[in-house]
Amino acid sequence: MSEQTFHGTTILCAKRNGEMVIGGDGQVTLGHVVMKGNARKVRRLFNGKILAGFAGATADAFTLFERFEGKLQTHNGQLMRAAVEMAKDWRTDRALRKLEAMMLVADADNMLLISGTGDVIEPAHDFISIGSGGSYAHSAAQALMENTDLSAKDVVEKALNIAADLCIYTNHNLTIESLNKED
């Protein structure tokens, strides 16, 4: 019997005109079966001031969100500091090292990708994506950012829907969270 693995998801973060947005789909797939269509893979952390989304094994997400929120508390909401400390732990902690996931995190000004290999990456553009449909969402977001005046929220929604049309591990049941610089 072959080992079945959890697949999927698409998470996209975009920033425009003082608005930071992270969105993700809700599909959880085990092997060739959709197990759940309405999972929440995007959350608000640290009293709503930080947005986070994950791609990877669903069970791992809860551990990652909890750990990252702890780092935010320890470092008083400093996104970069919390991300670097989280990545360090992820790389060195035996239990965390086995987690197969990636996270996008953002405050009102900055967005970061945190990987299980200990990388903390700040994107070159005002958008970044992860997950099985990440390249589709990234391409769509780039076209929308370069050729329209859509808000960050609209870019995220449209790009995720395009990814859902193309990626079998991504659906149209979206969760979208946003922060405004003025908040």
UniProtKB/Swiss-Prot annotation:
<dbReference type="GO" id="GO:0051603">
    <property type="term" value="P:proteolysis involved in protein catabolic process"/>
</dbReference>
<feature type="binding site">
    <location>
        <position position="170"/>
    </location>
    <ligand>
        <name>Na(+)</name>
    </ligand>
</feature>
<keyword id="KW-0021">Allosteric enzyme</keyword>
<keyword id="KW-0888">Threonine protease</keyword>
<comment type="subunit">
    <text>A double ring-shaped homohexamer of HslV is capped on each side by a ring-shaped HslU homohexamer. The assembly of the HslU/HslV complex is dependent on binding of ATP.</text>
</comment>
<dbReference type="InterPro" id="IPR023333">
    <property type="entry name" value="Proteasome_suB-type"/>
</dbReference>
<feature type="binding site">
    <location>
        <position position="164"/>
    </location>
    <ligand>
        <name>Na(+)</name>
    </ligand>
</feature>
<dbReference type="Pfam" id="PF00227">
    <property type="entry name" value="Proteasome"/>
</dbReference>
<comment type="similarity">
    <text>Belongs to the peptidase T1B family. HslV subfamily.</text>
</comment>
<keyword id="KW-0645">Protease</keyword>
<comment type="function">
    <text>Protease subunit of a proteasome-like degradation complex believed to be a general protein degrading machinery.</text>
</comment>
<keyword id="KW-0963">Cytoplasm</keyword>
<dbReference type="InterPro" id="IPR022281">
    <property type="entry name" value="ATP-dep_Prtase_HsIV_su"/>
</dbReference>
<dbReference type="GO" id="GO:0009376">
    <property type="term" value="C:HslUV protease complex"/>
</dbReference>
<dbReference type="GO" id="GO:0004298">
    <property type="term" value="F:threonine-type endopeptidase activity"/>
</dbReference>
<protein>
    <recommendedName>
        <fullName>ATP-dependent protease subunit HslV</fullName>
        <ecNumber>3.4.25.2</ecNumber>
    </recommendedName>
</protein>
<dbReference type="GO" id="GO:0005839">
    <property type="term" value="C:proteasome core complex"/>
</dbReference>
<keyword id="KW-0378">Hydrolase</keyword>
<keyword id="KW-0915">Sodium</keyword>
<dbReference type="InterPro" id="IPR029055">
    <property type="entry name" value="Ntn_hydrolases_N"/>
</dbReference>
<keyword id="KW-0479">Metal-binding</keyword>
<dbReference type="GO" id="GO:0046872">
    <property type="term" value="F:metal ion binding"/>
</dbReference>
<feature type="binding site">
    <location>
        <position position="167"/>
    </location>
    <ligand>
        <name>Na(+)</name>
    </ligand>
</feature>
<dbReference type="InterPro" id="IPR001353">
    <property type="entry name" value="Proteasome_sua/b"/>
</dbReference>
<feature type="active site">
    <location>
        <position position="9"/>
    </location>
</feature>
